[in-house]
Amino acid sequence: MVKRGDIYFLDLNPVIRSEQSGMRPCVVISSDAINHLNQITILPITSMKPTYKTIYPNEVYLPKEVSLLTKDSIVLAHQIRSVDKKRLIKYINT
């Protein structure tokens, strides 16, 4: 069962314009009370590049030690999306 706070790899294609695309980690933010439905609400995660100097108010820093991802990352809260569970590829961590 998908739970709020879980991190999964999702296939976010197809997308339009500047939406986050491809297979990438995402954190589930929808309520556990509705996560049994076919759709869940997620925030995509992107790897943190060494050139990043600022974390913006609509971003959350996610160290690799916490997420179990291979790199320090940033949760992109401004890219909130509802997606079908068929996009779930692989469970990573809670």
Identify the function of each model-found stretch.
Residues M1-T94:
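Conserved functional hotspots at enzyme active or ligand-binding sites that engage polyanionic ligands
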